[in-house]
């Protein structure tokens, strides 16, 4: 009986897995130039076309980067490199995937706020308070929302986990638009948001991680419920 030739997609996926394993195990270091497409294909025992597709896919994902006239390099991955990927995923999500992302955001935001309560410096707490006061003093939705985002960014930064902050930043683009719509469509939405933010700030000032976690979960949960019942077009 003749053996069935492997599907091209399967071969390409195997190449992707092999390259990522080489990076994970330190065989290819961040910033290092990849061997030529031909040499890498021979090394992994696959066709050049499958190798080309694997490299293209990893470049789109940000794992590899093409430098004109120089070759393909392993990206020097930093926490901030997660921003664009998570932002695109958040923007394109619908249905079940959106619901799952909202759950992820609620868990991460609550955890980040709890960490911030334990780690926040007086300077960082003052910055959070500045944005809270600016929200209270503002009347325009756009200005309020700008300080809203800055409020959450300051808390994420105070948590001291750059990767968590990067993921949360990437997940905020959809939430930003949702807050705009919520502010325009629901009477009293901004007042509720102000109260929720004040509760978070009080917990941070008290250096109470569990109170901070609960306040953040309640705040994000309100936005989450609103998004669940009013999906974007």
Task: For the regions a language model picked out, list residue spans one by one.
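Short, hydrophobic secondary-structure boundary micro-motifs
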Residues: 30-32, 165-168, 213
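Cytosolic histidine kinase catalytic core of two-component systems
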Residues: 123, 162-163
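Amphipathic alpha-helical segments in well-ordered regions
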Residues: 18, 111, 115, 154, ...
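C-terminal all-alpha effector/ligand-binding and dimerization domain
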Residues: 20, 132, 136, 150-152, ...
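Short linear motifs at protein or domain termini
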Residues: 1-108, 114
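All-alpha effector-binding/dimerization core of bacterial HTH-type transcriptional repressors
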Residues: 79-154, 192-214
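Short loop-to-helix capping motifs
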Residues: 160-162, 207-208
């Amino acid at each position: 009986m003749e053996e069935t030739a492997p599907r091209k997609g399967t071969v390409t996926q195997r190449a992707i897995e092999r390259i990522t394993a080489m990076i994970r195990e330190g065989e290819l270091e961040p910033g290092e130039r990849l061997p030529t497409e031909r040499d890498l294909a021979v090394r992994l025992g696959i066709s050049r076309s499958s190798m080309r597709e694997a490299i293209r896919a990893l470049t789109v994902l940000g794992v590899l980067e093409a430098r004109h006239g120089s070759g393909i390099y392993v990206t020097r991955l930093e926490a901030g490199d997660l921003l664009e990927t998570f932002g695109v995923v958040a923007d394109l999500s619908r249905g079940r995937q959106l619901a799952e992302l909202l759950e992820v955001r609620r868990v991460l935001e609550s955890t980040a706020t709890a960490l911030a309560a334990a780690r926040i410096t007086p300077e960082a707490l003052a910055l959070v308070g500045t944005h809270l006061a600016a929200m209270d003093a503002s009347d325009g939705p756009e200005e309020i929302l700008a300080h809203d985002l800055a409020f959450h960014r300051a808390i994420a930064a105070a948590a001291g986990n750059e990767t968590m902050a990067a993921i949360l930043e990437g997940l905020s683009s959809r939430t930003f638009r949702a807050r705009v719509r919520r502010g325009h469509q629901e009477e009293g939405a901004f007042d509720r948001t102000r109260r929720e933010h004040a509760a978070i700030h009080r917990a941070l000032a008290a250096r109470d991680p569990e109170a901070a976690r609960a306040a953040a979960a309640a705040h994000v949960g309100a936005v989450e419920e609103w998004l669940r019942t009013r999906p974007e077009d």
